[in-house]
Amino acid sequence: MFKFLLLIAFLCPPALFANEFCHILSNEANNRGVRFDNTDNVYKVGGKGRLHFYSAPNEKCIEKDVFVVPGNELYAYVEYGEYYSVMYVSDDGDQVDGWVKKDRLVETKYGIAPDYDTQK
């Protein structure tokens, strides 16, 4: 039995284990992270060059072909360490969810929900 498990581990690509690691970490980060108030969760991408998405808040989980550029707006939902869980909505309505490094994001001071406290 041990030889069989060793053979499977040898034949499985390392990406399979990385994907499982990233999936577990993303779930944990969503559960343990700090949630944003939807009245103040819209950010713009700042800096220069591409801001890559990650499938989880870890360098090992980079999505090399998924990125946004300066000026794009993101909706932040959870903060975990150096990352925000975000959604990007493209001009044609496609949505991309994932994690980005928060140091490239610039606050806009508005959100996707009305702030009823300021309307009193």
Regions picked out by a protein language model, each given a short descriptive name:
Residues 81-85:
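Short aromatic-glycine-enriched beta-strand elements
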Residues 19-41, 63, 87-120:
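Boundary regions of SH3-family modules and the immediately adjacent low-complexity/disordered segments
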Residues 4-13:
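Sec-dependent N-terminal signal peptides
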Residues 14-18:
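Sec/Tat signal peptide C-region and signal peptidase I cleavage site
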Residues 78-80, 92:
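Short loop/turn positions at the edges of beta-strands in beta-sheet-rich folds
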Residues 55-70, 76-78:
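SH3/SH3-like (including bacterial SH3b) beta-barrel domains
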Residues 48, 52-56:
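Core beta-strand residues in small-molecule sensory/regulatory alpha/beta domains
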